[in-house]
Amino acid sequence: MRKSNVILVALGFSVSSAVMAQQQRLPSDVYEVYVADKERIEREYKADKERCNSLDGNAEDICEAEAKGREEVAKAELEDKYRPSRESRYEVRMARAKADYRVAKERCDDLSGNVKDVCLEEAKAAQAAAIADAKKED
């Protein structure tokens, strides 16, 4: 009797593992759209980066931070679109918070002295608030 129970349990695990593995994969047509969307995001990032190269100084840094932020948020949104979950929604919110902070920090670089320090503190506070909001949602 024990041997048959062990066999049934092992069979149950293998079937549930196969079902879970099947759920993790995207159908081929959906996967092709996913890959195309991912490639589009990468092309847009490269084009944005090329536009940034025409700028100088901190304007270029701000432009690059904005481009990188758009790319990271778009990739996180893509993952959430094709594999929706609490974790993927959290990753979208975190990507937005990080992107906003990166841009705000670059904008503060144009300033100097106490004004720059205040700007950086405000950027950090905004990021902390965005992260806290991301953690409490869902």
Regions found by a protein language model. Give the residues of each.
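Bacterial N-terminal signal peptides that target proteins for export
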Residues: 1-7
